[in-house]
Regions:
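Active-site-proximal segments of metallohydrolase catalytic domains
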Residues: 215-291
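Short pre-active-site segment immediately N-terminal to the catalytic Zn-binding motif
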Residues: 189-192, 287-311
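Beta-strand-enriched, solvent-exposed domains that form extended recognition/catalytic surfaces
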Residues: 25-150
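Active-site recognition of the HExxH zinc-binding catalytic motif
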Residues: 200, 305-322
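Boundary at the C-terminal end of the N-terminal hydrophobic targeting segment
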Residues: 17-19
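Sec-dependent N-terminal signal peptides
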Residues: 4-15
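Fold-level signature of zinc-dependent metallopeptidase catalytic domains
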Residues: 150-207, 220-232, 238, 249
Length: 410
């Protein structure tokens, strides 16, 4: 059965089932799960790297056992006594993206990954699964977490100061986003806060974020670096910044990311966050966005605003790139419907945007997901395709709206 269909089915079941009580299984605290994903193109493995906890839980408190999107990986938390699934989370990773590169055919590498789940009141089983491009499980592992384990590190104070940029009236039913400074020195924090406000306004200038602005809490974390800027390996420039970001990810000149996920979440300790936007103090064009991991963007250039919004479409919305390359590496195949809501292989288009085709707001236009053939998008242009267009297309707006309501609706 198609993994995308399974997610839709689980969501429908969660809506009709008896509402799960957050307080029955969880404390108002966060359990941080550190993993190492490692391997090569033919063999992959998952390793537990560490556990820590901090006060307060800033993620969703509704639809805990459902997923809005399948992602390229999933975490499932199961109560060890009743066997009930009490929390699920989906994500994507740079590790899985790296597996599509030529290097993965001859070299094994490891990647840090960090995930947050609510702190259980009693022992739970945690299952982690990674999927390949055909939605088959390629790696999995299970482990148990006892909340009284003395080796779970307790963190009770922030590593850096933070400023609230926007506070919703209802903080119990809101989405928490944190801007994080990368490559800003202590004396440049005024610039970081200005850049954060610019990025925030750029996001809220796009529907459906404009109409749902009061559902978001935004903070800015003043994580100072000793030097300004970021590393540019192809130019022989390496800097020791607070988050270790760099261009040339997977030898792609403009691909700006950080592989130091533990550093990133250390910087966010005890801050109200669920989604992360890293602002990099550089004028060189670039960025990256990984679903339920982070949005990372350059700041000093003509396209800062559209880039940070585009990458947020990836990291928050799970949206796919809608552009194509003449020699793109295939990540989407005719026998598998992509989990991303804004592209289709027509394997199961019924779960995508047929309603918008019927209304005339969208169509089926071939080209997207880095491929010229075999993948279709809904509109000629979109924020997920180019920097020039002003808005998300109707397909992306619909997907983003559904996702936001999944998080916030009672």
């Amino acid at each position: 059965m198609n993994r995308y269909f399974l997610v839709v089915a689980s969501l429908l079941l969660s809506i009709t089932a008896v509402c799960q009580n957050f307080d029955e299984y969880f404390s108002d605290a966060t359990l941080r799960l550190d993993y190492v994903f490692a391997g090569n193109r033919t063999s992959q493995a998952i390793y537990l790297d560490g556990l820590s906890t901090s006060p307060r839980w800033y993620g969703r408190r509704v639809r805990l056992d459902a997923l809005p999107l399948a992602g390229n990986g999933q975490i499932t938390v199961t109560d060890s006594i009743s066997g009930r699934v009490v929390y699920r989370h989906s994500f994507s990773t740079l590790f899985q993206e790296w597996l599509s590169t030529e290097e993965s055919a001859s070299v094994a590498r490891s990647f840090e990954n960090v995930f947050l789940v609510p702190m259980p009141k009693q022992t739970v089983k945690i299952s982690v699964e990674l999927f390949d491009y055909h939605s088959h499980v390629m790696a999995s592992m299970q482990h148990y977490v006892n909340p009284s384990d003395v080796l779970i590190r307790r963190i009770d104070k922030s590593a850096h100061p933070h400023l609230v940029l926007q506070q919703p009236a209802d903080t119990a039913h809101c989405i928490n986003i944190a801007f994080v400074a990368e490559g800003y020195t202590a004396c440049q924090m005024g610039k970081f806060l200005d850049d954060s406000r610019r990025a925030m306004e750029a996001i809220f200038d796009h529907e459906p974020f404009t109409s749902l602005r009061d559902k978001f809490r935004i903070v800015a974390v003043e994580s100072a670096s000793d030097v300004d800027g970021t590393s540019e390996p192809s130019a022989g420039k390496w800097l020791d910044t607070v988050l270790g970001s760099h261009f040339d990810t997977f030898y792609s000149t403009r691909y700006l990311t950080t592989l130091r996920l533990k550093r990133l979440h250390d910087a966010l300790a005890c801050v109200p966050y669920e989604h992360i936007i890293v602002l990099v103090n550089t004028s060189k064009y670039g960025g990256g966005g990984i679903y339920n991991s982070y949005d990372l963007s350059y700041t000093d250039g003509e396209y800062f605003e559209p880039v940070v919004v585009h990458e947020f479409g990836h990291s928050f919305g799970g949206l796919a790139d809608e552009y194509e390359y003449s020699n793109g590496d295939p990540m989407y195949f005719a026998d598998t419907e992509p989990w991303e809501p804004n592209i289709t292989t027509k394997c199961d288009f019924s779960v995508k945007w047929p309603n918008l085709v019927d209304s005339g707001e969208a169509a089926l236009i071939e080209g997207g997901g880095y491929l010229e053939k075999g993948v279709w998008r809904g509109c000629p242009d979109c924020r997920m395709r180019t920097n020039k267009v002003k808005d998300f297309c109707p397909v992306c707006r619909q997907a983003l709206s559904r996702l936001i309501h999944f998080y916030i609706d009672p």
